[in-house]
Amino acid sequence: MFRTHTCGELRISDVNKQVKLSGWVQRSRKMGGMTFVDLRDRYGITQLVFNEEIDAELCERANKLGREFVIQIVGTVNERFSKNSHIPTGDIEIIVSELNILNSAITPPFTIEDNTDGGDDIRMKYRYLDLRRSAVRSNLELRHKMTIEVRSYLDKLGFLEVETPVLIGSTPEGARDFVVPSRMNPGQFYALPQSPQTLKQLLMVSGFDRYFQIAKCFRDEDLRADRQPEFTQIDCEMSFVEQEDVITTFEGMAKHLFKVIRNIELTEPFPRMPWSEAMRLYGSDKPDIRFGMQFVELMDILKGHGFSVFDNATYIGGICAEGAAGYTRKQLDALTEFVKKPQIGAKGMVYARIEADGTVKSSVDKFYTQEVLQQLKEAFGAKPGDLILILSGDDAMKTRKQLCELRLEMGNQLGLRDKNTFACLWVVDFPLFEWSEEEGRLMAMHHPFTSPKPEDIHLLDTNPAAVRANAYDMVINGVEVGGGSIRIHDSQLQNKMFELLGFTPERAQEQFGFLMNAFKFGAPPHGGLAYGLDRWVSLFAGLDSIRDCIAFPKNNSGRDVMLDAPAALDPSQLEELNLIVDIKE
C-alpha cells in the first residue's frame, strides 16, 4: 500500500496515528536541526518533519530531496506548534520515520505554485506540470462536478444519453470542417462534427423524444479567448415541444447549476430580449446587462449643425458613463485610440462632460450651442459628473458594434463587470437569415434546420430577410453560454429553406438527403439546445479564457505545443492515404 491517507485528509483528531503518505515535494526548508517538507497530492498539502536528533541519516536524505520528487513516507501525526490557517491540514504535521524515494525529478521550468512564474507558452508546453497547480486542478474538478450534475438533472427529466458518431460527412454551412481522409475509400473524406445537429434530429425521428450527450465538437475557425478548435457541448433535443418548453427546461437546468455549483439561488424568470432590441440598445446579440449604459440614438439632436462628421453620418449614438466626468484628457485620448484600433475600426470619438453647474462641455463645442448640448444631456438623463461618449459612422450596424466595444471597455474601467455578479437573459426572435457579402446570398443565421416563427412563414416568398427564427440564445454576463431553436420537421418547408439558401434540389439531396428521407417516415415537432460546457465552467470559475478549464487545450494558433500538433505526416502515410501535399506559396 502506497498510502493510508491523502495529503489533504489529516486533521487534529488524527494526532498520534501512524500514517503512510505519497506525493510530490512542493518545497523543503532546513531550520537548525530540522528539515520541513511540504508534500503535495491532488487533495492538498501536508507538512513533513525530519529531525536530526531522532534520525540524522534520515534527515540527511531529506535534505537531498528536490522539488517535484515523488516520495512515500511513514510517520506519526503530530500537532503543529506553529499552525497554518491557510490550509485544511494546517493544525498537524507528520514526524517522519521512513522515507522512500519513488522517483527523482529534474527541476521544473516554472514553479508549481498558484502564483507561478511561468508564462502562458511555457505552461502550455509543460501542461502536465501546470495541471499539478491547485488553481488549474480546481477548474477540472469544477468541470467534473458540472458534468455529474448535468447528467443527474437530465436523467431525472427522462433524457437518454446517446453517443453519436465522430466520423461523419462534411456539410457546407457554418464554420469550416476538420476533415479526415479515408484510407479504405481513396479520395474521400470524413468530417469531424461541428455539432451532432442532424444526428440528434434523426434520433427524434427514431422516437427518442429526450436525448442528450456531452459531445465533443470541432470547428476549424479563427480562435479567441472563448473558442477552441475542439470544444464540448451539453447537447440536447426534445420531441413534441414548442419554444417555451425548451426554454423552461433549460432555464431550470441553469438555475440548478447556479445553486449546486455557486450556491446562488435564482428565483426570478430570466428576462427575454428580442434580437432587434439587443442590437439597438447594446450593439450585440449577447449583451452584458450587469450594467446600464444603453445606447441612445442622437441623429435628431446632433445632425445638421455644421459638424461634417455627424452631418454625413448614417448613425450617431452614444453612451453615458455615470460619474466619469473626471476623466483626464489623457484618459479620453486613450479611449479614442481604443476605438480606432483596427479590430474595432471607429474613426474617432466625441465626448461631453456634465459640469457641476449642469452645463455641458464637449469636444465639439464650436459646432453646438449650449441649448443643443442640453438636449443631448436630457436624451441620456445625464447628471452633473457624468460623461457622454459618442460614435458615428455610415453603417449603423457596424457603428453600434464599435459602440458596444466602447461600452464594455468603460464597464471594465469603472469596475461594473464583477465576475461574481451574474446577469442572465434569453435573446429571442433572431433573424432567420443574414446576408453574406462574401457569398452574395442569404445565409442561415443559425443553421438550415431552424424553423421560422409560424406567424412569419408567409414572408418566405415575399421578404425572407424579414423572417424571424424560432431561435433562442442564453446569455450570461455578455457570454453566449448556449443556444438552440425549434427545428423544421416538414419536408416542404425544409426544401423551401434550402431553396432560399441557394441550394439546388440536387445539392440539397446530396448533402442532406438522409435527413429529408427520414422526414418522409414521420418526423415529430422537435427542438433543442446546446450549452457550451467550457464556457459554463469558465463563467463559474471566473476565468478569462475557456483554455484554462480544458485539460489539454490548443494555443491561439490552434497548436498543441506539448504534443507538437498538427505536424507533417510521414511520406509513407501520405502515400497510403493517396494524398499529395501541395503548399501554395
Curated annotation (Swiss-Prot):
Kindly state the subunit structure of this protein. Homodimer.
**Region (Aspartate) location:** 197-200
Alphabetized UniProt keyword annotations: Aminoacyl-tRNA synthetase, ATP-binding, Cytoplasm, Ligase, Nucleotide-binding, Protein biosynthesis
Tell me the superkingdom of the source.
Bacteria
Where do the annotations place ATP binding? 219-221, 228, 480, 532-535
Q: Which SUPFAM superfamilies match?
A: Class II aaRS and biotin synthetases, GAD domain-like, Nucleic acid-binding proteins
Q: Please indicate if the UniProt record lists Isomerase as a keyword.
A: no
Q: Could you tell me what this protein does? A: Catalyzes the attachment of L-aspartate to tRNA(Asp) in a two-step reaction: L-aspartate is first activated by ATP to form Asp-AMP and then transferred to the acceptor end of tRNA(Asp).
**Name of protein:** Aspartate--tRNA ligase
Q: Mind telling me which GO cellular component terms the entry cites?
A: cytoplasm
| Catalysed reactions, semicolon-separated | tRNA(Asp) + L-aspartate + ATP = L-aspartyl-tRNA(Asp) + AMP + diphosphate
Q: What is its EC number?
A: 6.1.1.12
Q: Which organism is it from?
A: Bacteroides fragilis (strain ATCC 25285 / DSM 2151 / CCUG 4856 / JCM 11019 / LMG 10263 / NCTC 9343 / Onslow / VPI 2553 / EN-2)
* PANTHER family xrefs: ASPARTATE--TRNA LIGASE, MITOCHONDRIAL, ASPARTYL/LYSYL-TRNA SYNTHETASE
Q: What one GO molecular function would you report for this record?
A: aspartate-tRNA ligase activity
What GO terms in the biological process aspect are recorded for it? aspartyl-tRNA aminoacylation
The record's annotation in HAMAP family points to:
Asp_tRNA_synth_type1
